[in-house]
Design a protein with these regions (language model features):
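Rossmann-like dinucleotide-binding core of oxidoreductases
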Residues: 3-10, 14-36, 43-45, 136, ...
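Alpha-helical recognition domains of nuclear gene-regulatory proteins
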Residues: 28, 49, 98-101
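Feature captures the FAD/FMN-dependent oxidoreductase FAD-binding
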Residues: 81-148
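Conserved beta-strand scaffold positions in the cores of enzyme catalytic domains, especially
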Residues: 66, 108-109, 164-167
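Glycine-rich active-site loop/strand segments that organize a redox cofactor
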Residues: 51-94, 214-249
Length: 249
């Protein structure tokens, strides 16, 4: 969608973010309720956290057949997961598949970061201002930015004097990073650190991990999904959906 907007256009609903939640909201608001809906996405493509977090080893720690949309039987039957715990690239491919299958891309404006939201109490309308000073108006606004949309960069003394390369798992470059024959330090052993450490260690000359608080970690026991499992899952979609809904309560 073009970034140039006609400011006279008022949308029924504007969704901020094109990750899992944003895509689902666009589908429900546009296709099920019939609202004129627009998604504003800061990135260049859909994916949300799976667009930004593309560090080595990035992977979901929920099983693939539970980490997906259940509102569309067509998507459930046409998409095949390859692993028990899918990696970042596969999840991103899945979200692009969902976007194209449901025809959502036409209602998403990329490279558009919302910087301010104001409510006009006289006109009962939301006014959204973006980083390029464009304005959008909507009766409803849905924030679907999630809890992982902003990278937390620690303030460490001397960082500005460091002459080497600095990377953050939440702001990983799209192009591959070569760690061959390099000394690497990783700060933190949360989920991102645990996933990245063994992958980076394969190529780095030396790897040092800085850990503040020891944690308990067990092997993921990841595995490829067999054709038998996929077939069984697709034949019992209603059962799995019922079980997952019950597990929420």
């Amino acid at each position: 969608m073009s970034i140039n907007q006609n400011l006279s256009i008022t949308y029924d609903a504007i969704v901020i973010g094109a990750g899992f939640s944003g895509l689902q909201q666009l589908h429900f608001l546009r296709d099920r309720i019939g609202l004129k809906t627009l998604v504003l996405e800061a990135g260049e493509a859909v994916g949300g956290t799976w667009y930004w977090n593309r560090y080595p080893g990035a992977r979901c720690d929920s099983e693939s057949h539970t980490y997906c949309f259940y509102f569309s039987e067509k998507i459930l039957k046409e998409w095949n997961w390859s692993e028990r715990y899918p990696g970042q690239k596969e999840i991103l491919n899945y979200l692009n598949f969902v976007t194209d299958t449901l025809g959502l891309r036409a209602n998403i404006q990329f490279n558009t970061r919302v910087k301010l939201i104001q409510y006009d109490q006289i006109k009962n309308i939301w006014i959204l201002k973006t980083a390029d000073d464009s304005e959008f108006r909507a009766k409803y606004v849905v924030s679907a930015v999630g809890c992982l949309s902003s990278a937390n960069s620690p303030e460490i003394s001397g960082t500005n004097k460091f002459m080497g390369e600095l990377y953050h798992t939440g702001k990983w470059p799209h192009e591959p990073v070569d760690f061959a024959n390099k000394k690497v330090g990783i700060i933190g052993t949360g989920s991102s650190g645990i996933q990245a450490i063994p992958i980076i260690a394969r190529s780095a000359k030396n790897l040092t991990v800085f850990q503040r608080t020891p944690n308990f970690s067990v092997p993921a026991r990841n595995s490829k999904l067999s054709d038998e499992f996929i077939s069984k899952f697709k034949s019992k979609i209603a059962y799995y959906k019922k079980e997952m809904l019950a597990a929420r309560h």
